Amino acid sequence: SDLRMDFNKQNDLKVTLFFSIINGKTLGPFPDWIGKPSLGSISEDNLIKALDAILIRYDIIDTVIIAGDTEEYFRYSEQNIPVYKELFDGVYGPLKEKHPDVKFGNAFSLHGVINKNLSHIVEQLDVGDFIAFSYFPVDSLNEINKTPQEAGEDLETIMKLVPDKKKGIFEISWSTSEFVNGTEVEQTEFVKKVYDFYRTNQPQLEFVTWYRQFDRPEGTCVMTPEKTEGQISIGGSSDLGSNEFVIERLNHYICNSGLIDTNGNKKPAWNEFTKQVQMSKNS
């Protein structure tokens, strides 16, 4: 971590810290000294001390995401939203006082919010300095089911979901895997849509980050079904919607969502990405 942070500092780069009190369906993972507490028993003091120590050590951190894929955790436990809001507020106040230039917020999966109709959870957790969103143009089975134009329209829903607070785009992507209906042409077109969205809404955006620069070898991107808790199923004897089916597609999606392939060849979207960066610098 120190080497990476030193590299970022030498190149005058700022860093977003993803702390993950909540990480999708689960709490944590936490360091051993925290153990495995329930949401209501997480110590505010311990979290404040841990985050304070990190922010003092790495002064290039300018944003902190306390929870990620937050809508998934509260999907079946909305009664715990007030508990989390109290925890967040209790941590936010002292840290903001000591580190006034650091922004604190939570992240949501925009495609999860849209696919599962969970916008009300985002609205109830409108806390902190910003609300961040990740985005894959996929259905609940992790197959691409949007055109770049439709995906661009999905991004516009962020402005309606969070009208009065800064927004962040955290880990946005488009896979080129044919296995999940991806193509290089559509990835390139989506890069254009992302920059159109950025330029139109720049005053309201805290940050925008692409999910992955480089592809990874197939099968190395997510947990295996055996290590995944719970079961995703549509019922009956069909394998459609099973853990294995969904995770297989997520593997293919993530491993091929980079802008440069595993052989080091630049995809057309990489050239478009660099062109758009240059256009933004010159505008």
Predicted regions and their residues:
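Aromatic- and acid-rich polysaccharide-binding/catalytic face
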Residues: 17-19, 59-62, 66-68, 106-110, ...
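Acidic (Asp/Glu)-rich catalytic clusters
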Residues: 2-16, 53-59, 120-127, 157-163, ...
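Aromatic-rich peripheral "rim/lid" segments of glycoside hydrolase catalytic domains that contact
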Residues: 179-180, 185, 200, 204-205, ...
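Short, acidic/polar
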Residues: 43-55, 113-124, 188-197
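Conserved, mostly hydrophobic/aromatic
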Residues: 64, 91, 131, 171, ...
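Substrate-binding cleft and catalytic face of glycoside hydrolase catalytic domains
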Residues: 2-80, 87-103, 109-111
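Active-site clefts of carbohydrate-active enzymes
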Residues: 23-29, 133-139, 158-194, 210-231, ...
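The substrate-binding groove and active-site-proximal loops of carbohydrate-active enzymes
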Residues: 32-44, 69-82, 136-148, 181-185, ...
